A protein has these predicted regions:
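Structured, solvent-exposed acidic/aromatic patches
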Residues: 1-281, 292-299, 336-338, 396
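Long, intrinsically disordered, low-complexity segments
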Residues: 108-110, 123, 273, 330-397
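Short loop/turn elements at secondary-structure junctions
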Residues: 166-168, 298, 303, 359-361, ...
Length: 397
């Protein structure tokens, strides 16, 4: 909340000063304004995903004559998308290149920035809904139109090599591979791939009685299908079997599997590329948009197979029925999988650790959050107290 509004405030101040003539960057004025609008839109959009309401701040707001009003998250997202669209107009009307340290590691062109904004509009539209009905009601044709103009390669930043907490650093990537300490992969993510009865037995127990177990996964990202000399499972391409959990906490959170995909982030001390928007996410968004708009099963299957077959080692989804948004994640063709169930499983598997909050928002929109889970967060208490407003919260049973 505070970091995002700090970014919005800085971007807004920059636009105000350029428009007022207090600052002139010559031929680079449009580059600065376009980038500032991008920052405004990205930041407001994240606030709309996370919180139930927020402020909208841009260069048109006169703080000297009044105060900002909290407005519902949908209105915040509307403003965010308008800001991203305004950035796109500037990017497409001009031909410039950003300095490589504005988005660390690459000097992005104005055309590439327009693609980035289009992809974020598609991402934000899909993730905003708080339930299944709202997710189905998304204008998926607009999502598709933005995907058609969106990213054509993975997007992210280059880590600065300065370790944890540095400027160009992602805590999501850094901590997702900390399996040797506290980071474990939840069975609700990987369990659907279990070909033994371990996961179904685990689910059948009361949460207080659940404990960690060894799966027999058919997913090559989790296990390569062979055993080491000491009988442990040899690693998959993205995960591995690890030792027993030593934490003192509820055993339903224990797991014998760790996520190893981004280990180079920590082993290099943050000196590697950090991908924040994978091309596979564009494919998953396109697949879901086709599901909602009557697209062909073969086109959907082709998109899902890019990770399901190539990374997971599963058979093609070409013969599967469409299913519905009510289908639980399931990658197994031999166990009643549908295109919908594979989409849910694949998207959560492939994008694990890529962008903070992604799986939380997906489960919310698909109606799969655990009972009692809050659907969004309240405005932070510090701001409520400053404005003299009542504290409140969400969630619980």
């Amino acid at each position: 909340w505070f970091g995002l509004y700090g970014a919005i405030s800085a971007a807004t101040d920059g636009i105000r000063n350029i428009e007022a003539g207090n600052v002139s960057l010559g031929d680079d004025n449009e580059r600065a304004v376009g980038f500032a609008k991008l920052v405004q839109g990205l930041s407001h959009g994240y606030i709309a995903l996370m919180f139930d309401k927020g402020f909208v701040l841009d260069e048109s707001v006169d703080l000297a004559s009044g105060t900002l009003e909290l407005i519902p998250y949908k209105d915040v997202m509307d403003a965010a998308i308008k800001q991203l669209e305004a950035a796109i107009v500037i990017f497409k009307a001009n031909n410039f290149t950003l300095p490589a340290d504005w988005i660390n590691g690459k000097a992005y062109t104005s055309a590439e920035l327009a693609q980035l904004a289009h992809s974020f509009i598609a991402r934000y539209m899909a993730l905003l809904p708080r339930d299944k009905a709202a997710r189905a009601a998304v204008n998926w044709s607009v999502v598709l139109a933005n995907l058609d103009k969106g990213l054509t390669e993975d997007w992210g930043v280059m880590g600065d090599g300065a370790g944890r907490g540095s400027i160009w650093y992602s805590g999501t990537h850094w901590y997702s591979s900390q399996w040797n300490v506290w980071q474990r992969v939840d069975y609700k993510l990987i369990g659907p791939s279990d070909e033994s009865t371990g996961y179904s037995d685990w689910l059948a127990k009361a949460p207080a009685d659940r404990d960690e177990f060894i799966m027999e996964s058919g997913d090559k990202r989790i296990w390569d299908g062979t055993l080491s000399a000491n009988g442990t499972q040899n690693p998959g391409t993205q995960m591995l079997q690890i030792g027993q959990t030593t934490f003192i906490r509820a055993s339903y959170g224990f797991s014998r599997y760790g996520h190893d995909r981004f280990k180079e982030v920590t082993t290099s001390n943050n000196a590697v590329p950090i991908v924040l928007f994978r091309m596979s996410e564009n494919n998953f968004l396109r697949a879901e948009a086709l599901m909602h708009t009557g697209g062909s099963n073969s086109a959907i299957a082709g998109l899902l197979d890019k990770t399901h077959v190539n990374d997971g080692g599963y058979p093609s989804t070409a013969s599967l029925a469409l299913g519905s948004i009510n289908d639980a994640p399931n990658p197994r063709n031999d166990d009643g999988a549908t295109l919908w169930s594979v989409l849910k499983y694949e998207k959560n598997m492939d994008l694990l650790g890529t962008w903070s909050g992604l799986q939380y928002w997906e489960k919310r929109g698909w109606g799969e959050s655990t009972t009692g889970t809050l659907i969004h967060f309240p405005v932070p208490a510090a701001d409520l107290e400053t404005m003299g407003l009542q504290l409140y919260t969400f969630g619980g049973v």
